[in-house]
From Swiss-Prot:
Annotated keywords: Isoprene biosynthesis, Magnesium, Metal-binding, Thiamine biosynthesis, Thiamine pyrophosphate, Transferase
Quaternary context: Homodimer.
PANTHER family (alphabetical): 1-D-DEOXYXYLULOSE 5-PHOSPHATE SYNTHASE-RELATED (PTHR43322), 1-DEOXY-D-XYLULOSE-5-PHOSPHATE SYNTHASE, CHLOROPLASTIC (PTHR43322:SF5)
Enzyme nomenclature, EC number: 2.2.1.7
Protein name from the UniProt record: 1-deoxy-D-xylulose-5-phosphate synthase
CDD domains tied to this protein: TPP_DXS, TPP_PYR_DXS_TK_like
Amino acid sequence: MFNLLDNYKDVNDIKKMSLDEKKQLALEIREFLIENVSKTGGHLASNLGVVELTLSLFSIFDLNHDKLIWDVGHQAYVHKLLTGRKDKFHTLRQFGGISGFPKKCESVYDFFETGHSSTSISAALGMARARDLKGEKHNVVAVIGDGALTGGMALEALNDVGYRKTKLIIILNDNQMSIGKNVGGVSRYLNKLRVDPKYNKFKEEVESTLKKIPNIGKGMAKYLERLKNGIKKMVVSGMFFEDIGIKYLGPIDGHNIKDLTEVMTAAKKVNNPVIIHVITKKGKGYEFAEKNPGKFHGIGPFNCNNGEIAATSTNTYSKVFGDEMVNLAREDKKIVVITAAMRDGTGLQNFAKEFPERFFDVGIAEQHAVTLAGGMAVEGLKPVFAVYSTFLQRSYDQLLHDICIQKLPVVFAVDRAGIVGDDGETHQGIFDLSYLTEMPNMTVMSPKCMAELTHMLKWALNQNCPIAIRYPRGGDNVYLTPLEDFEFGRWEYILNKGKIALVAQGRMVEHAVLAAEKLEQMGILVRVISACFIKPLDKVMLKKLIEEDVTIITIEDNIIRGGLGSYILEYVNTLHRKVDVINLGFKDEFVRHGKPSILYKLYGLDTGSIVDKVLKVVKLSGIF
């Protein structure tokens, strides 16, 4: 079925293939990806778009010496197939299986681990400068998408690349989402000339000869250079790169292996930084993904025959958030919403459609988004920044310096807080409590159910301070009655009997309630408290628990260090009272990829583990 792919054993095997064989291999890879990702889920559209690009990179560069870095990394599936992981592909993004991103522990050819965007050029530049300092001669290549190129970090790196003129090859994978491609005969002609090494050599010889002519030589050379640059600026979008000192080659058809290998061969001969602008199509070769690349960007299991996704719950925290923002915006014209290239992921499609003038998608620019919100707040608007937990951490300084110091009323809708599952270490939202609670003037909240999120948003938008509301991926698993009225820093009793209190936040309240029900069947009563405010703590309730000699077990989907439990312990220590406080949460480590249910059990946060912990406390303390 996959004749060429099945017989592919070494990273350099492709160098022995004819052009026709490479084209056949591309077809086999697409078929393999569609078949396998339909079962495991994953990032399909972006990988279908880089098949020929990846084959060309492996054809021209020798990964036993050269270095290849994939920005974000979710488009590295073809790379994984060609570096010995085909037989493990059925475990993609599964617990104990291969990651959906480059991982150094998986392969010596995964030279730098990625997951967040816009990092590849910086990493590649660092590796290139290390190469030069060590006197080595290999190539370093960074592959970055047009979306990731909007990130400030990528632009900072480009500025540095051009200034120092370090030899580096950058592949701009433009899937027509952000950067417009050049069209027209003149553009194609100039590109053909600039790619041809003979043209570059001829141009250098002409310039050298002209400069030797007395009186007019240097002037003529400068005139021709100005004329050439003037023409380029009119027809070639790559002049931005040229102007900052990076040679631009392109645009190139990213699905034409012959053209790709020719331009990459030419780029290898340039001793300065080069950027190759490649045009690709997301979802290439799979009709359903080509028509709807957004749907197939990150997708769960689906029917590969018709592109239909396996049935899932339609109601999620993200959808509830998006719908509520529309409702609130209809009532209050001061409400504005900001997102950083995550409109659909954060559930804001309808808001963007109904209030386009009050919706701001700033691209992959979380730092800018936070301070933009601050500026809006200063002028009396009510900004809401919707962002995944894992990406909010990119704007730490702006949160602290631009928002909290001034105590600006910005609401941060922190989506995907806690375990997100299959994307693994780079995307788990388990650090936000630790850095948000340490910021003066920041209030941190967490709803126990989707309905409670709607009331929390309405309340937060009428406060005069920065507020972060963190909520998980997916929807409710247990029905819980929402709290509708909030008092600053006050928690809620769900159950109020027993000498052990389960103090939980967010989704962990579900786990605590289910654990309490099981314990009650065993004759053990426990209290369940929803810590809807992580900061400030409900010190009144805590003092009462301590006075009643109640053992406190905190449950959070955050790392323990710096989280809810740590915050409670810090407060309890100020009271100089003997009290047992047990913290359940994630250890001081990165959480691997896997289904949330598996990860909760692994870290002792599932219902059964909570029951076991309570039983252990009961046995040791003799409370009952």
